[in-house]
From Swiss-Prot:
GO terms for biological process: 'de novo' pyrimidine nucleobase biosynthetic process; 'de novo' UMP biosynthetic process. The keyword Flavoprotein applies. It catalyses: (S)-dihydroorotate + NAD(+) = orotate + NADH + H(+). This is Dihydroorotate dehydrogenase B (NAD(+)), catalytic subunit. It comes from the Bacteria.
Length: 304
């Protein structure tokens, strides 16, 4: 049986539905000894800001039951460094390179999108709207449908690249925000970003993370992420990249059945650098065993 694993996220053609979560795969180079990057549907690289950022105080990572808390604080060398040092590598790849962007203001997102729009080797932008809005007292852009839509619109007006907006789960109604972002022109959605959490050292009687709170990822968040994908799929008509605790092909297939067109592998990369490759192989095996020729037949099939 000939299998079709190819999917589309807006104008983005992917040879299969598997990509990587920003911040867990570096800039691709770090994992190239383990995985043929060109065999992935896409790679999403580490988050980029307009100016270099040092990130949050240490410790920045702590293991929790079935997950990891991280508080990296968007440490990166800034967009100029990305364009000079990483884009030449991106140009050599056949796979789609998606750059994750963050800003302190809507204007910063727009400036960043415009800079990246000029570069070859970048296939799409993923917009992290979980950042604090410095003009609105630090509330996350993604916490309110109006500011989420505003950032989306500014980015869309600043680039011809496909725009994928990464939604925060730390909200009351994720479907409302998804609809607002779709209305503002988003080409796709990444669902979900990390859940806000913390850990406390009982000996020191202090939070473990240097920044007190951090983002929870890994298997612990999977039921929440699946629920979010299910709700968003029913609310919008644009494609979804599902993520949150995907460790194997079975996890990935659950997200696709819930409505995700593609899936993003994050924490699993830390545990097993071959995770993405093994998930693709597991998907192929499932399709063969079940007599399904096209992965797209499974998208949202659990809703039927």
């Amino acid at each position: 049986m000939k299998l079709n694993l190819a999917v589309k996220i807006g104008q983005l053609d992917m040879i299969n539905p598997v990509t990587t979560a920003s911040g867990t795969f570096g800039y691709g180079q770090e994992y190239s000894p383990y995985v043929d990057l060109n065999q992935l549907g896409a790679i999403v690289v580490k988050g980029t800001t307009l100016e270099p950022r040092e990130g949050n105080p240490t410790p920045r990572l702590v293991e929790t039951p079935s997950g990891i808390l991280n508080s990296i604080g968007l440490q990166n060398s800034g967009v100029d460094y990305l364009l000079e040092h990483y884009v030449p590598f991106f140009k050599k790849l056949q796979t789609n390179v998606i750059v994750n962007i963050s800003g302190n203001t809507a204007e910063e997102y727009g400036q960043l999108a415009a800079r990246l729009d000029e570069a070859d080797g970048i296939a799409a932008l993923e917009v992290n709207i979980s950042c604090p809005n410095v003009k609105k007292g630090g509330m996350a852009f993604g916490g309110d449908f109006r500011t989420a839509a505003e950032v989306t619109k500014v980015v869309k007006n600043s680039t011809a690249l496909p725009v994928i907006v990464k939604l925060s789960p730390n909200v009351t109604d994720i479907a409302e925000i998804a609809r607002a972002v779709e209305g503002a022109g988003a080409d796709g959605l990444s669902v979900i970003n990390t859940l806000l959490g913390m850990a406390i050292d009982v000996r020191k009687r202090k939070p473990v993370l240097g920044n007190t709170m951090g983002g929870l990822s890994g298997p612990a968040v999977k039921p929440v992420a699946l629920r979010a994908v299910w709700q968003v799929y029913k609310a919008v008509h644009i494609p979804i990249i599902g993520m949150g605790g995907i460790m194997n092909a079975t996890d990935a297939l659950e997200f696709i059945l819930a409505g995700a067109q593609a899936v993003s592998v994050g924490t699993a990369n830390f545990v097993n650098p071959y995770a993405t490759k093994e998930i693709i192989q597991g998907m192929e095996k499932y399709l063969m065993e079940n007599g399904i020729g096209d992965i797209n037949e499974l998208v949202g099939a659990a809703h039927l």
